[in-house]
């Protein structure tokens, strides 16, 4: 049974000229194909800001997979979903497929 590593680097995000926020993700998550992967991102600003999730594969540009905490762009499979609770947001990939192996980044942005 193969394991799919989902690599999750720490991302520090500056949102505007006067403020910067640190978002923390776990170093990595590995799951077997068909399992559910839950990737968390924590930061003090998250209750006041929307979270955005990006998938990036080697040699490719990042792809937005979730915006405004839980909205899924057109063309993104339904197995990708997002949720938010307090200072933590979660990207869930249900029924992980081999093609989901990638880096996943969270970003925050003002909700106004």
From Swiss-Prot:
- State its location(s): Secreted; Cell membrane
User: Positions of the region Complementarity-determining-2?
Assistant: 68-70, 107-112
What UniProt keywords apply to this chain's record, in alphabetical order?
A: Adaptive immunity, Cell membrane, Disulfide bond, Immunity, Immunoglobulin, Immunoglobulin domain, Membrane, Secreted, Signal
* Listed InterPro entries: Ig-like_dom, Ig-like_dom_sf, Ig-like_fold, Ig_sub, Ig_V-set, IgV_Light_Chain
Q: Which SMART domains match?
A: IG, IGv
| UniProt key word Zinc | no
Which SUPFAM superfamilies does this UniProt record tie to the protein? Immunoglobulin (SSF48726)
Record-annotated disulphide pairs: 41-106
The superkingdom listed in its UniProt entry is Eukaryota
Query: What is the recorded name of this protein?
Result: Immunoglobulin lambda variable 3-25
């Amino acid at each position: 049974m193969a394991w799919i590593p989902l690599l999750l680097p720490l991302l520090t995000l500056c949102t505007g000229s006067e403020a910067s926020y640190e978002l923390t993700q776990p170093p990595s998550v590995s799951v077997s194909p068909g399992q559910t992967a839950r990737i968390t991102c924590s930061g003090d600003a998250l209750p006041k800001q929307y979270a955005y999730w990006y998938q990036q594969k080697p040699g490719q540009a990042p792809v937005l997979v979730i915006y405004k905490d839980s909205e899924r762009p057109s063309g993104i499979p339904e197995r990708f979903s997002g949720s938010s609770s307090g200072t933590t947001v979660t990207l869930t990939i249900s029924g992980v497929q081999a093609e989901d192996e990638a880096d996943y980044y969270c970003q925050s942005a003002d909700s106004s």
